[in-house]
Amino acid sequence: MLLPTTIDGLFLRDLRMDDFDGFSSWQQDPEIARCFAFTRTPRTQDETRRVLTEIVGGAHPESVHLAIVLTGQETGEESFVGVVSLKNRHPIDLHAEFAIVIGAGAHMGKGYGKAAARRMCLYGFETLRLRKIYLNVIADNVRAVRLYEELGFRFEGRFREHFFRDGVWNDLLWYSVFPSELR
């Protein structure tokens, strides 16, 4: 699968095993890992390899995980920017959980995450026929909260002191978006 975005040279494609080095470096970066609600510590290379192997092998058909890739206009060489996902797609309720990570610091703040997130949501609504996309985010992840609100996600609730990290209890925020709300 190959999905273009609104930024020239930025597209979404299927994850591949040769993405392991970039994928692994982010999974092991403590600053990136601290933004994930699903893990408290960076993943080992073995854990990361297992996760990537499951994704590439189609072990979770209810989920779509795509690489965010920037192609050099002169060389055509790919730069692996991040991963965007629609997980736990429900076949009756027609909703899925959204997730995104921009792994390379040099690619942050350039609009790549917003373009990739919007494209993935459009794919979810138009191709997968979802009626709702939802997500959760740790409350102190201000950059992510800002992105989601800019895309039209609406705040649905707060799980107070739900997530223990770095010796502190953190709130977990829940957001969702319907097709008519996506910006």
Descriptions of predicted regions:
Residues 1-106, 177-183:
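GNAT-family acyltransferases
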Residues 22, 97, 115, 132, ...:
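Amphipathic alpha-helical recognition patches that constitute DNA-binding helices
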Residues 104-106, 110, 139-140:
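Active-site acidic-Proline motif in GNAT/NAT acetyltransferases
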Residues 109-123, 145-150:
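Conserved acetyl-CoA-binding loop-helix of GNAT-fold acetyltransferases
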Residues 113, 117, 140-144, 161-166:
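Short glycine/proline-centered loop/turn elements that form peptide/ligand docking sites
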Residues 126-136:
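Conserved GNAT acetyl-CoA-binding A-motif
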Residues 134-137, 154-171:
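Conserved catalytic-core motifs of GNAT/GCN5-like acyltransferases
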Residues 148, 153, 175:
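Conserved active-site tyrosine of GNAT-family acetyltransferases
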